[in-house]
Design a protein with these regions (language model features):
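Short, flexible loop segments at the rims of nucleotide/cofactor-binding pockets, characterized by
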Residues: 39-43, 106-112
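N-terminal subdomain of nucleotide-sugar transferases
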Residues: 1-38, 44-59
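Short N-terminal targeting/anchoring amphipathic segment
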Residues: 2-4, 54-78, 84, 89-91, ...
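A short, active-site helix/loop in glycosyltransferases that binds the activated sugar's phosphate group
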Residues: 124-149
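Short loop/turn segments at strand-loop or loop-helix junctions that form parts
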Residues: 32-34, 91-96, 134-135
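Membrane-proximal helix-turn-helix segments that form the acceptor-binding/catalytic region
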Residues: 110-130
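A short alpha->loop->secondary-structure connector
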Residues: 82-85, 109-110, 147-149
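Short catalytic/ligand-binding loop motif for oxyanion handling, primarily in non-cytosolic enzymes
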Residues: 12-14, 39-40, 72-75, 97-100, ...
Length: 149
């Protein structure tokens, strides 16, 4: 099976997971990534840049595996000529609804933090399957989602 793993924030644990998955998978895994910097921009604009590359490179995977840092709904909209019938899975390495904010980040103080969690939510809606790195992580998101919505 050919898998295209899409990761717009390719650094730290995100990079380790993607690279180790590609290395140890029994499948043919192609990494489609952006450098791991400016995470907020990557969540908003990463899908646009990666969709352009996906189309330009003519990738034809059997499965699209997206990181939770990707706005999957936007990515799929921009690549629908190729991905309309492509199975997709969203891998939740973390999520922006329950992930603790840095004390140096001013977005929560200005009530600008909810849209990152909403990107995670709409990405999950757009995916055919949603995978979590742990049962704890799954339960943390599911328990907070009703209040958020």
């Amino acid at each position: 099976m050919k898998i295209c793993l899409v990761e717009p924030f390719h650094t730290g644990s995100h990079a380790t997971w993607a690279e180790e998955y590609a290395r140890y998978s029994g499948h043919e895994v192609t990494l489609l990534t952006l450098d791991g910097r400016h995470w907020k921009w990557r969540m908003h604009g990463g899908a646009v840049a990666l969709a352009k590359r996906f189309m330009a490179e003519g990738l034809e995977p059997d499965l699209l595996l997206a990181s939770d840092m990707l706005d999957l709904a936007t990515f799929l909209a921009l690549t629908r000529a190729t991905t309309a019938n492509l199975p997709t899975a969203l891998y939740c390495h973390e999520n922006q609804l329950t992930y603790p904010w840095s004390p140096d980040d001013h977005d929560p103080q200005h009530k600008r933090d909810a849209h990152y969690a909403f990107i995670n939510y709409t990405s999950a809606l757009a995916a055919d399957a949603v995978l979590f790195n742990s049962h704890f992580h799954l339960e943390a998101l599911i328990s907070q989602l009703p209040e958020f919505l």
